[in-house]
Amino acid sequence: MAGLLGLKAAWPLVGAALLSATPALAQPAGSPAPAAEKPVSEQVDNPLADPASPPAGQPPTTQAPAPAPEPAAKAEPKVLIAEVVIEGLQDHPERERLELAAYAAMAATPGSRVTRTELQTDLSAIYASGWFSDVRIQPVDGPLGVRLVVVVVANPVLQQVKLDPADLKLPAQVVQDTFVADYGKTLNLNTLQTRMQELQRWYADQGYSLARITGPSRVSPEGVVELLVRQGTVEGVEVQFLNKEGSTTNDKGEPIRGKTKPWVVTREVSLRPGQVFNRRELEEDIKRIYGTGLFSDVKVTLKPVPAEPGKVVIVLGIVEQSSGSISGGLGYSQSQGVFGQIQLQDSNLFGRAWDLGTNISYGQYGGLGDITFTDPWIKDNKYRTSFRARVFFSREVPQLFQNENNSFTYELQNFDGADFDVVTSRTVNNNGTETVTTNFDTVAIQRIGANVQFVRPLNGGNPYKKAPWNLILSFGGQEVTPMDFSGSKYSYGVVGATSSPDVVPSNQVICLAFNCASENQLVSFRVGATYSTLNDPRNPTKGNFLSLGTEQFISVGENSPTFNRVRGSFTHYIPVEWLKLFKGCRPKPGETKDCKQALAFQVSAGSLVGSDIPPYEAFCLGGGNSVRGYYDCDLGVGKSFAEATIEYRFPIFSIISGEIFFDAGTTFGTQGDIPGNPGGLLGKKGEGYSPGIGLIVTTPVGPLRLEAATQDFTSDWRFNLGVGWKF
């Protein structure tokens, strides 16, 4: 007894003291909520005072002198640990594992000397192992030292993890896969935190960057763990207009007022109030906003909602760019000769993203003009349907009535009989000939008309879904008039006349329009579809593009024909890396590869169905967008056709690319099925092929093509200058 009293006097730390660490875990359902958790240091029972201090309530034996310097801090006393015992796990299925975890967490071992602070640290370490919901250390005096009895309460065996709220973006299978290795085992709070971080990473990987997982909010004795999930929701979307410097106010301190209607911007945003915020969706939304072509910069700010944690307002800072433009230039085409052109356009009419433009060109052989109105997305249409209306006027020399001419321009009058000339009068002779008079004017075709078109993506009513399929419906009407350059109407044309009057075979005199009329009225509707999986709409290297369409012409009078035009094309791109001339195709370590090259294939075909075919509606083969070794419409004029192209595109410098191509086309012998057989009379072959090479220069207005191609591997070469890729 004296030894025991002596030990107590030597270490007031122990005595009858009890040290405990009881984490405030959630209680079973229906239990009262626990009090706020105290620090571990405050969970130590009966912390004894310094033995040098008098007992509480007892006055000191001597009067304290005048204030004196504090004595040096005394070292904590240490006692000998005789034994460490873990209790509370007698019937636990993982007793051995948990006991080892508790022992491993403690620094105090039999034979060691420890202080009260060190013992408290051990208590905290046992709890920090994550296996226990309650930890208490009871020092018991013994003849050989202090016996430490560590009483623990193990966490329940994990059976299920629930998320609150239940309506989450996180799939149940992801939760199951995350915790499957832990089910049926004692819950470890450290492992639980690791699993929560895995779920947090899943949210981040899926773009839910505002989502937060906390808890556990409740751990039931049956092993059901509840975690709190705050996904982060959108409260609203606001549009804020900025100047070029990024300021919301002008020099006078007034708010910047934009031209664009706010709904033009917000309709491109898929994130709606109440929806879970997703960074990926917002990035796609920003791309769509840029894709309108109306804005030079878009700044995004997430504004937290006061008093509503987890809710944000998306603020879009918009910098508008000029929507009006005027441009002009000079050019050359076979149908117009040398021409001048002027274009006027406003791409944001009335701030509603409407596009209104006019194009006027006038050349040696005619001119054309049109006014086009486009609404890229009819307001409040969930299918993102677009609308376009066009009014046009043109007077051109159709190349189907022309033969090859290697000179820079055509003559307005043709005296050698190589092309069709207008017939001013004709007399039919009995011997299969006709006597014709002509002014040797080249045949011109004038068109005046209008059309409207609707395009609807097959997106299932989701305007933000990338739909590969699009449906096209259009209606149109036009009046077509064959004439000479003075504007006089003529119904017949002749080829081979070298004088006026002249006697020519009757088959060399043809009708220039349907029913040999001076005017034709064409009324039609067209149904079409497109399918695209291209990886880049401007310079694709991978994917497919399919276009199908049928246009039905309906008679509205004696000189109005009825027929149908069917046409389709298919394009396929295969990414390759054959030539590595461009340095981007040979990146150094750490550099990003930039080597856009592809092997491209295109097949197109079409046919006219019916007998009322106006000659000017025939299919033309040859030209910069057809078989490139031939001039426009110089290969064939047919009722049916097919073309095929194989092309290899590769970069050379940053803005210069090269191409090697092979084109081929045929009319399937249908030149004679066109009334008057203009292609046959002009000696057009009807089929041919063309290998060639080219350079493509990337410019602000698009790619410019400079190509050289030969006709059927002969010495006849043609040079072509075009805008944009052929396909």
Predicted regions and their residues:
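A generic structural motif
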Residues: Q90, L473, Q552-V556, T710-D712
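Short glycine/proline-enriched loop/turn "hinge" motifs that connect secondary-structure elements
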Residues: N381-K382, P537-T541, I696
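C-terminal outer-membrane beta-barrel translocator/porin domains of Gram-negative envelope proteins
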Residues: S488-T670, P675-N677
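C-terminal beta-signal and terminal closure region of outer-membrane beta-barrel proteins
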Residues: D673-F727
